[in-house]
């Protein structure tokens, strides 16, 4: 974990031997500062649940969709709202939506800890052909 600190994330990358291949940037997940179709993959780890409003979480998912290239993949690991994320990705036209969970022991710990021990990942793939969000709205 990096504690949401870019310097810690860069140190983790250095320890893994990949620091020269990454750039750390802090941004609002509801308004990402990247052009449309910039990335092959988007990875979010224990972040989106921090948006307390479902509409704001939906905006974050829309931003993930916007910055993904066609056929790009999103991996969203979080401690709650998994069904909401899967439904949101489906509304955005993602395919191959999967829930990747933990072992029964970890699931039990999650149940008694209100989810704090068991992030579940939602994986989804952006369709290879799509219409941009901006084109649909205007």
What does each of the following model-derived ranges do?
Residues 25, 43, 75:
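Conserved Rossmann-like nucleotide-binding pocket used by diverse enzymes
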Residues 1-31:
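Class I SAM-dependent methyltransferase SAM/SAH-binding core
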Residues 27-42:
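A short acidic, Gly/Pro-enriched loop at the edge of an enzyme's catalytic core
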Residues 92-93, 97, 105-138:
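Core SAM-dependent methyltransferase catalytic element
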Residues 9, 13, 81-92, 117-120:
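Short alpha-helix
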Residues 57-70:
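A short glycine-rich, Lys/Arg-flanked "PGG" loop and its adjoining helix->strand segment in the class I
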Residues 71-78:
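Conserved beta-strand signature within the Rossmann-like core of class I S-adenosyl-L-methionine
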Residues 40-55:
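A short SAM/SAH-binding and catalytic strip from SAM-dependent methyltransferases
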